[in-house]
């Protein structure tokens, strides 16, 4: 029996297409996706989108057992994977360039674990599963987003923003950081580290509002620097557990008095933010207004 050449060509093309689908892992369900979900700074600050994503997930990822307990209502009944914060150690460094054998071994192990975790995520998504990595606050501020850099660019993925420490701390003091009377800039920074080019001393020279994330923070050093660039009566505020109605606390002082009157040594590690700037007192007032905007609104 003779075959129609067009029919035969169609069968061949269909077979090639099917083989490609099987080969690249697609076509199983087509609904697999990797999410990074910002959980907010408190259990009740998760967004509606975040809740829906977690409900739809087959696998959830957390950094620790503590986080699993905090988000137990969301994690219940899900397969749980762990991605500890320590996996960020030496990310971006080539272990082969490290001379110290012990440090090199740590870097090699971290790189290997990151790669294995990325491979697991890819395999799960290729199988049509939804993987949701839950992260406190907003993942775009010191979160673990490096996994997206290790995954194929065409892998379906999405970041669900969360209410971060900056937003929650600003709400706690009931003042908006961009309003600094005669400044508009807001500098988000952290403790200095060796090799850093934009060190805090340089940033302070602008006189802008400053927001310090306090990991490994040296208060005496930072305030000795602040005192060289800000008037002693410049207001400061430390917000502990920003956004948590049960434990949130605001400690107020000034650049000149802080080290003398504040018990900063007993602040809970990595659970507080330092705000520095005139906005804490003046609110939304401007020194001379903004004439261009005022003219637009007067028309």
Tell me the role of every PLM-derived stretch:
Residues 78-85, 156-160, 177-184, 231-239:
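Short hydrophobic/aromatic-enriched beta-strand-loop microsegments
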Residues 135-207, 248-252:
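Class I SAM-dependent methyltransferase SAM-binding "motif I" and its flanking Rossmann-like core
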Residues 10-20:
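Bacterial N-terminal signal peptides
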Residues 58-60, 80, 176, 187, ...:
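Short, well-ordered beta-strand core segments
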Residues 2-11:
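Bacterial N-terminal signal peptides that target proteins for export
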Residues 25-160, 272:
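Class I S-adenosyl-L-methionine
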Residues 67-69, 88-90, 164-168, 185-187, ...:
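Short gly/pro/ser/thr-enriched loop/turn and capping motifs at secondary-structure boundaries
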Residues 29-36, 103-110, 123-131, 148, ...:
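A contiguous loop/helix-start segment that scaffolds small-molecule binding in enzyme catalytic cores
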């Amino acid at each position: 029996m003779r075959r129609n050449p067009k029919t035969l060509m169609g069968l061949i093309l269909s077979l090639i297409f099917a083989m490609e689908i099987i080969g690249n892992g697609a076509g199983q369900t087509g609904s697999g996706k990797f999410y990074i979900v910002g959980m907010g700074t408190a259990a009740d600050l998760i967004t509606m989108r975040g809740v829906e994503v977690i409900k739809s997930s087959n696998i959830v990822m957390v950094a620790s057992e503590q986080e699993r307990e905090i988000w137990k209502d969301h994690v219940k009944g899900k397969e749980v994977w762990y991605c500890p914060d320590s996996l960020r150690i030496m990310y971006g460094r080539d272990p082969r360039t490290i001379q110290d054998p012990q440090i090199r071994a740590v870097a090699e192990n971290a790189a290997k674990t990151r790669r294995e975790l990325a491979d697991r995520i890819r395999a799960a998504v290729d199988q049509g599963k939804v993987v949701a990595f839950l992260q406190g606050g907003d993942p775009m501020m010191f979160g673990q987003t490096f996994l997206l850099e290790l995954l194929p660019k065409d892998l379906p993925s999405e970041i669900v923003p969360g209410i971060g420490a900056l937003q929650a701390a600003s709400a706690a003091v009931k003042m908006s950081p961009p309003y600094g009377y005669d400044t508009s800039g807001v500098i988000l920074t952290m403790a200095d580290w060796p090799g850093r080019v934009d060190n805090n001393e340089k940033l302070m020279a602008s006189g802008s509002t400053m927001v310090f994330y306090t990991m490994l923070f040296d208060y005496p050093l930072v305030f000795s620097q602040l005192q060289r660039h800000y008037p002693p009566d410049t207001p400061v505020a430390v917000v502990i557990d920003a956004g948590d109605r049960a434990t949130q606390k605001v400690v107020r002082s000034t650049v000149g008095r802080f080290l003398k009157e504040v018990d900063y040594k007993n602040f809970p590690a990595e659970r507080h933010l330092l705000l520095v700037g005139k906005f804490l007192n003046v609110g939304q007032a401007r020194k001379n207004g903004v004439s261009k905007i005022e003219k637009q609104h007067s028309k």
